[in-house]
Amino acid sequence: MQSTGKTGISSDQEAEKVDRRISVAPMMDWTDRHCRYFLRGFSPDVLLYTEMITAAAILRGDRVKLLGFDPEEQPVALQLGGNEPAQLAAAAAAGEGAGYCEINLNCGCPSDRVASGAFGACLMREPALVAECVAAMRARVRVPITVKMRIGVVERAKRESIASVADFNDGEFDALQRFVAALEAAGCARAIVHARKAVLGGLSPKENRAIPPLRYDIVRELKRTFSQLPIVVNGGFRDTREVLDALGWSDGVMLGREAYHRPFVLAELHCALHPERTRPLVARGTLLERMASYAEREIAQGTRLAAITRHMLGLYGGEPGAREFRRLLSHAAHAPGAGAQLIRDAGRLCAPA
């Protein structure tokens, strides 16, 4: 059931309670409230993020629809898109009022559509404006204000050599330092750094996640330079060992598509980071029934089953019957009148959990 998400606990108390070592990135068309509810079942601690929502949409649109979420999703952060300080501050206040534990500003999305609105990755060229936006939000809310960014931005036509995108000269690192210094001075609580450059123009968002090479060394050097500012590294992490290694030098790791396609990585990380709890990996059957019950509640409120099941295709990844599980949820969930029982039926195609 969709809710405002309010918990009755003060924003300061909530901020102190959140374990920010592992998080799941905001991903357009993916990390909606149904996806977040599903992912929450794998770990009680992982910090989840909304899809990017523009400040203008929140101020002019249906806030219940845009900002509502199930309390079980907590801890969950709201990512905003925009470049106007007063507008972002008002949207941040709306997000805090809805119960989000953090407000994040998108300064990393390289898509042409986002760039046409003069926000996303192109904002990295305007550190003074971003600092003004952060300060305005910080003055308006008590929850932490964070920024998601790249290590830099370049303009390259697709036909040109991409080799220069791999280079990172002293001038580029100086620009990165100036940007982060401006964030820190404005009161940014945490910088979330995708360890790639953003190529503006000529590359699609998908290509921007693959063609610019990963430069964890740049993020590591940034952490050495800004030792007092929490820095989370994002980009390209594929398994638990890589994440745990990165936690040795960073303040957190943000996972993206790996968590979506192989959500059990979240359970593996939870167990690795909390060995004192001696909790076994959550059973797939338990997760399946949790989602079936959720679907029953949501369908009663008018939600289509397919809107929920589309996020569940990785539940039985690597297990016997996984292909049949995915096929049933991918197709039958779209049938008129499809109900939550379909989730249970799909689970029966797989090995006992």
Locations of regions flagged by a protein language model:
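Alpha/beta catalytic cores of nucleotide-metabolism and tRNA/nucleoside-modifying enzymes
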Residues: 1-18, 22-23, 28, 132-135, ...
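Glycine-rich, positively charged N-terminal anion/phosphate-binding segment
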Residues: 5-13, 27-101
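Non-cysteine beta-strand/loop elements that form the S-adenosyl-L-methionine
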Residues: 50, 102-111, 186-197, 255-258
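Active-site-adjacent beta->alpha loops and helix N-cap segments on the catalytic face
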Residues: 58-66, 111-136, 200-220, 262-267
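Active-site beta->alpha loop and helix N-cap motifs at the rims of alpha/beta catalytic domains
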Residues: 75-146, 150-158, 162, 167-172
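Catalytic beta/alpha-barrel core
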Residues: 125-126, 192-194, 211-212, 233-234
